[in-house]
Amino acid sequence: RVNSDLVGKVVNIASRCAGFIGKGFDGYLAEQPDNPELLAQIQSFKDEIGDLYESREYSKAIRLIMALADKANQYINDKEPWVIAKTDKQSPELQAICSSGINAFRLLMCYLKPVLPAMTASAEQFLAIEPLRWDDLDQLLVGHKINKFKPLMTRVEADKVQAMVDATQKEFEELAQTKAESPAPAAENTTGFEDEIEFDDFAKVDLRIAEIISAEHVEGADKLL
């Protein structure tokens, strides 16, 4: 299920649009996407998906991302860019439609980066962009030149994807544990008195009183009797 979602939904968005952009427009995206409403809808889930990652609900986050991918794929199905390309490979409409698809792909890959960093790195090379950051979800690629599309992945086993998710979750948990175990910095002493030990610690001290019965001079010593 995870495998078909990743390949058939997210990556397929790029593979369906990149060829038209490369052949008809020398790799350049349109200055204005065809469907800014769709892209705005994908962007609107930035906080919700971020919160799901923060609460370690990775499965819910991925399901939501895949639902957004469904919307992007449906948009491409409805617009049928391949039909437009048959009559005009340099149609501005074709460029705008495929630019919307590429931008949707970029946004979805940004959402997936916390759990699929290696795959996202390949997407970044294809998109010819700097490493994606969460704040990049607020921006779109316009008038930008992308590279030739190469298959980002041909097969991803569900257990491997789950292993990636588990590894990411483990890193979060280890970081949280480290923070929890780190001792809080000692409070600065502003009383003017030396620090005192707790009574419980004082009670553990073995104090004994001894009576000196006799004392004799120690030969060669100038400070001892």
Language model features: what each stretch is:
Residues 1-96:
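Long, charged, mostly alpha-helical binding arms that flank functional sites
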Residues 51, 56, 66, 70-225:
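Basic, alpha-helical terminal appendages of large translation-related enzymes
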